[in-house]
């Protein structure tokens, strides 16, 4: 069974939030979820490094963890498993959506 194709409005909404950390309700984190064809879910977070520590290179990185259990430090966050993308469009294409 293949994953359902997201509607254009849903993709536009996700891209809007991916690009605007000032709109993230749990700033500096944005919880994201990927719903798999088998019914399981992958949980992750985007983290606003730019406006916290100024680190670069992690803007389109999904850290694989539940937002409730994010580590206390950036170093611990960076040590988590992650999926790295070049653009937010790629994040969306990998089926990550705002949770």
PLM ranges: what are they?
Residues 1-99:
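Terminus-proximal functional modules
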């Amino acid at each position: 069974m293949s994953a359902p194709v997201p509607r254009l409005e849903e993709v536009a909404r996700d891209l809007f939030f991916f690009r605007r950390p000032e709109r993230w309700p749990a700033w500096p984190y944005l919880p994201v979820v990927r719903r798999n064809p088998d019914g399981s879910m992958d949980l992750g977070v985007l983290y606003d490094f730019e406006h916290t520590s100024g680190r670069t290179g992690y803007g389109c990185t999904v850290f694989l963890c539940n937002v409730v259990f994010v580590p206390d430090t950036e170093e611990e966050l960076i040590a988590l498993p992650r999926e790295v993308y070049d653009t937010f469009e790629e994040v969306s294409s990998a089926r990550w959506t705002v949770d």
